[in-house]
Amino acid sequence: MSNSADQLDPIRLEIIANGLRSIADECFIALMRSAYSTNIKERKDHSIAILDKRGRLVVQAALTLPIHIASMGGLTTCVLEKYGVNINEGDIFIAN
């Protein structure tokens, strides 16, 4: 960033990060509560992450299992290769 106007101040950054983390946490809980699988419902064996348009991790739910996050890289690459030019703002991809 060449210009100080392009930089995000730390307070605003923290507010945005916490907002995104709250969204991920709410998605985690919603999936857990609505699941039929005991692995998800009782063992919490699932993960939620928010990625940017390049597939980089922005935030993950607090209870997310890191092993699941590690596998999202390959999945994201495949999604971007298949749908990249057709992905629009607000699109969501869910994978198992």
PLM regions: where:
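Glycine/proline-enriched, intrinsically flexible loops and inter-domain linkers
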Residues: M1-N96
